[in-house]
Amino acid sequence: MNELTNFANPVAKPETFDQIQIGIASPERIRSWSFGEIKKPETINYRTFKPERDGLFCARIFGPIKDYECLCGKYKRMKYKGIVCEKCGVEVTVSKVRRERMGHIELAAPVAHIWFLKSLPSRIGLLLDMQLKQLERVLYFESYIVIEPGLTPLEKYQLLNEDELLEAQDEYGEDAFSAGIGAEAVRRMLEELDLEGEKEDLLKELAETKSELKPKKIIKRLKVVESFLESGNRPEWMILEVIPVIPPDLRPLVPLDGGRFATSDLNDLYRRVINRNNRLKRLMELRAPDIIVRNEKRMLQESVDALFDNGRRGRTITGANKRPLKSLSDMLKGKQGRFRQNLLGKRVDYSGRSVIVTGPELKLHQCGLPKKMALELFKPFIYARLDAKGLSMTLKQAKKWVEKERKEVWDILDEVIREHPVLLNRAPTLHRLGIQAFEPVLIEGKAIQLHPLVCSAFNADFDGDQMAVHVPLSLEAQLEARVLMMSTNNILSPANGKPIIVPSQDMVLGLYYLSMLKEGEPGEGSLIADMQEVHQALAAKAVTLHTKIISRVPQTDEDGNQYMKRVETTPGRMLLGETLPKSHKVPFETVNRLLTKKEIGDVIDIVYRHTGQKETVLFADAIMALGFRHAFQAGISFGKDDMIIPEAKEKEVEETRLLVKDFEQQYQDGLITQQEKYNKVIDAWSRCGDRVAAEMMKEISAVKKGADGREKPINAIYMMAHSGARGSAAQIKQLAGMRGLMAKPSGEIIETPIISNFKEGLTVLEYFNSTHGARKGLADTALKTANSGYLTRRLVDVSQDCVVVEVDCGTDRALDMKAIVQGGATIASLGERILGRTAAEDIVDSKTNEVLIAEGTLLDEAMVAAVEAIGIQSVKIRSPLVCESKGGVCAACYGRDLARGTPVNIGEAVGVIAAQSIGEPGTQLTMRTFHIGGAAQLNEQSNLESVADGSIEYRELRTITDPRGRRVSLSRSGEVAIIDSEGRERATHRLPYGAHLLLDDGAAVAKGDRIAEWDPFTMPVITETGGIVKYQDLIDNQTLTEQTDEATGISQKVVIEYRATSRKEDLRPRLTLLDDSSGETARYMLAPGAMLSVEDGQEVKAGEVLARVSRESAKTRDITGGLPRVAELFEARKPKENAIIAKVSGRVEFGKDYKAKRKIIIRPDDGSDAVEYLVPKSKVIDVQEGDYVKRGDNLIGGSPDPHDILEVLGIEPLAEYLVSEIQEVYRLQGVKINDKHIETIVRQMLQKVEITDGGDTTLLPGEQVDREEMDEINAKADAEGRTIAQGKPVLLGITKASLQTRSFISAASFQETTRVLTDASVQGKVDTLNGLKENVIVGRLIPAGTGAGMSRLRVTASSRDAALRAAQRNWQESLIAPQTAAEEHAAELRQPVQADTGDDPLGAVVGESHGTDADAGDYLTEE
């Protein structure tokens, strides 16, 4: 019966595996890999080039050098396969085994593995609870360590130097205690560790400890101890006795001409180890003095360190040319390492590259392929076809024919290429549209022809760009290329769902020209019957393209019947109308207007949405041809006279000069500060530039009429800019207006502007000034490319395993979407934001109470229009952020696939798409941080106007009426809402402290009415009661100073910052109000910089202003913009000047000051513990004593720290904050990215939870685990009736999140390879290969896209096999040793029916169907 237990499936291929585990190799394991011990450092004999025996390239150990041939030549050829030659000891087999057979070196003394020693935190150090410094002293033979103190007073693990050791031995006797040195000692210590006991001690200590920092350290140690216990690794394996030697073909030695050799650095490192090891053996045999042996051991340790990780410790070992040698770790690390160079990015065959030229006569799905290239790329196909047709007898002859390029070959090439798509790729491939499939068209010449419309997707131009061609070989690959990657299938951009196949440059110019309408052209007002007559009239020059005419255009009604419709239009627009697809959804009106680039994009969008892909492709090709033809026929060009310098320029410049002189004088007189003068000058000049530019645009765009009443041709430069073909208003401003202000390399603006424009020419000084900015621009561009690429790489890495896994996860969480409104202007409408998302609740029309859109509907354009029409303010939608799917997201939460306009398919790699969509425009973002002066900051809002008609409603607003009868807001979290006539809330606004309210609660407002106004630059301190003011701690020249305004001569009292000299002094400047009986009624703390508005002892009434604090915004501040800001947000870094957020709602009190900080205390209403904050005194505090703050309110201005938002307000507000901040940066550059991409990345940043309470699980408080992992552990605990663990979500930056994915292969290939692998091996991690990256690395089909179904089937099948095998094992175990006949009989009965089918449990599996999900039974539903 026992042979049955060997049921390793004999037919299973080694490639079929489901997971990969990494661990620490034991010495036995290393020996079992090895084919022999390497005893000599020799490599090959330099005369015969034969490997030396027992050396690093030994043929006996590693295998033969030539296929099926032993070293001495006794056995040659296949027939001796498997024989071991008795003379040279070499097995006769293929030489390929030299790539897989390993050797080993038996070390004379153990050495520590540097990864486990030096990779922080040091694993050996944590286990032994020793410092790395002390460990190193022991390992590198500097001091002894007490291993077993015995009965002596020495402590365990105490370090002793030589003298101390001798003293101790004299005192207590040699055998009373045991001490050791070097790796042997550390090894003994690791062997004697009782991990179980250690774990119990640590858990006990953790429960008892009171200190703050102790638990962290204990948890670190606990995790290491636990990982050793769980993984089955033994601690002593971190000390090596045997070193594996990698196969010789992976560290080749190649003879160069001239008798020298090129060798891999590893050979040098191995030789070093072997030499020292052999010397050490000899010294030990000779019984050399201890000190010499010890030195040799230390050197052995160092050489092994260098082999594993050169440069990690001590000096780097260098080769002959002073270059550091590449160790095993360096082979894996970095861009040139194994992971990124060979596993993630490979070079492929069947590819070629060439320069691209434009191919305007191609169709959208075609590309021109040079015949020469095609012949080379499709060679095997041609050989096969020649053979199949019987034209060539042998392969050799076929090759000859192809080389001679006989005419039969060209005919066959045509057949081969027909319907065989090829892939074109342009580097850098920033998003998935950088590789697209086309059908090749054979062309003469040597350049690839590219269709002009796909240029924007590839970001290609024809100034010498090159592109690569790849041939998809297998039928499946061709199918995918045609169905998924064909350029005609990629009309919409995956980033924002807008068409990316949009005419540009010449085409736009031609279409703009075609659709222009001019007054007074010949034949104006004629009636022309139809298109044919229009063509005739144009040919006869009776009308021009721009004449206003009345004509009839054919239209299609809903049933598809044609009818003629009368319209007023121009012949040019009718030509355009001809190209429109025939559909009632796309009427002639869509093109009956002046078409700029943006409008043409909209037209293509409409055509795509209403008539589908095929029509769109035809339409795109048609308008491309039309655009090119008319741009060519119009002959638009411009000369220098088209750059019109406005008359008003000189006047404007003169006025500004006078103004600037005035500011200069004020500064000289000391009325304004240097900074203020600078801001005012910059402001004056930038306004001047803008006014000149406006004048110039007015003149350029003016329509002039000739003597005959015809309009003169419009200005060509204006035409190019306005149509969006080329150039922009800013560029024209530099040509014909004034060049304006320039920046220094530091980013500051130079005060003297460049007044000339390029037409006038710059003076020498101006030219010199402008060189700064020009050079910085070039330097920035270079930096930007690298930074943007790195950002994309981090984004892809964090999101690569986010795939659509199911149709609907059924979550009941949702996001609330509102329109984004800033300063009264709608930046993103509600419709834009909810388009293509799934509604998470029924959308109800509040007037009729009918359900417009049911929950779970994917909102399309028509529904969105309906929602906007009834004026709904906010809609609850599903989002990847709230999705509860395991191992990915669900289709309902994700919504529409933007590149297709349909619901997203299962298996779509939405994570990678999100990363590419955010990373690809990265190069368009700026690099700089903006320095904004006071003047430019004047756009700070200072009043509030109603956005709609309705009534207003104040919320949480305390007001007081001041002596002048105005109502003043006293709360910091007050809001005003505008309610329209149907009772719907149209907008809500925060009202700042001290705002004047112009309307009563519930008052009616019209659109544009003012509701409130306030001073944006100062924040008042307002008294709530009347009384007499008393100064407290306001002492002249200590905390108070008088400043006199020189322009007006009025002096003001200003509070200044005071540093306490002695400990007892604690000056806290404040105003107190006394009532009639001198009782204190209120106190007001004053921040440094507050200007007092009342005198000591003055009587005040309620609502008066006691003091004013100037707000930060009036000063200059740096705004981080562009790429650095996006990176800062995705990395979840703490901002420089971060705001402090109230963690609880409650009343504010000020505690006792602490050195240079003030203490703010918030007492919650529910009587729970107060929360304290320490704030630097220099900061302006936004709250006063006694104020009521809500949770999440700012106590101090600035940008909030995302971690705080998550902790205080939760996931949804955090996501909203991140999305809006990131969108803000892209919006400034005019880049559109759909919100869902950013949400997908934020979801990946929020995967981890920090355990707050471990319950009865293995989780420890304070450790971070995946939310999915915690759920799994909790489900298990719950089933067993133990208490479950609790956790709170934590936000990780993208780099951190990628390094902490559950897959160690993915993390190792990203960054910090050594650290990740060390970690993983200690824990004995298992990589289940769920993400895309891991699968690419192990060389499997990725589990996304078309691979998703395959991976699903594989999982199903393997689970079914496992179940069968388990059943088989059960009855085997009962059969192995039956004690009595009765037992044997029972066992026989238990045996399943299929037992007769032989050993292989899979033999009985009947393929009843194609393995659908249903066959898998519970397996798939369990997940």
From Swiss-Prot:
EC number: 2.7.7.6
Binding site for Mg(2+): 461, 463, 465
Cross-referenced CDD domains: RNAP_beta'_C, RNAP_beta'_N
Presence of the UniProt keyword Lipoprotein in the record: no
GO MF term set: DNA binding; DNA-directed RNA polymerase activity; magnesium ion binding; zinc ion binding
Annotated InterPro entries: DNA-dir_RpoC_beta_prime (IPR045867), DNA-dir_RpoC_beta_prime_bact (IPR012754), RNA_pol_asu (IPR000722), RNA_pol_N (IPR006592), RNA_pol_Rpb1_1 (IPR007080), RNA_pol_Rpb1_3 (IPR007066), RNA_pol_Rpb1_3_sf (IPR042102), RNA_pol_Rpb1_4 (IPR007083)
GO cellular component, one term: DNA-directed RNA polymerase complex
Region Disordered, residue ranges: 1383-1423
Alphabetical list of Pfam families matching this protein: RNA_pol_Rpb1_1 (PF04997), RNA_pol_Rpb1_2 (PF00623), RNA_pol_Rpb1_3 (PF04983), RNA_pol_Rpb1_4 (PF05000), RNA_pol_Rpb1_5 (PF04998)
Coiled coil regions in record: none
Swiss-Prot/TrEMBL keywords: DNA-directed RNA polymerase, Magnesium, Metal-binding, Nucleotidyltransferase, Transcription, Transferase, Zinc
Cofactor dependency: Mg(2+); Zn(2+)
Class of the enzyme per the UniProt entry, highest EC level: transferase
Residues noted as binding Zn(2+) 2 in the record, renumbered to the chain: 809, 883, 890, 893
Signal peptide range: none
Residues reported to bind Zn(2+) 1: 70, 72, 85, 88
UniProt cross-references to HAMAP family, sorted A to Z: RNApol_bact_RpoC
Subunit organization: The RNAP catalytic core consists of 2 alpha, 1 beta, 1 beta' and 1 omega subunit. When a sigma factor is associated with the core the holoenzyme is formed, which can initiate transcription.
Similarity-based family: Belongs to the RNA polymerase beta' chain family.
Function: DNA-dependent RNA polymerase catalyzes the transcription of DNA into RNA using the four ribonucleoside triphosphates as substrates.
Protein name, UniProt field: DNA-directed RNA polymerase subunit beta'
Record organism: Rhizorhabdus wittichii (strain DSM 6014 / CCUG 31198 / JCM 15750 / NBRC 105917 / EY 4224 / RW1)
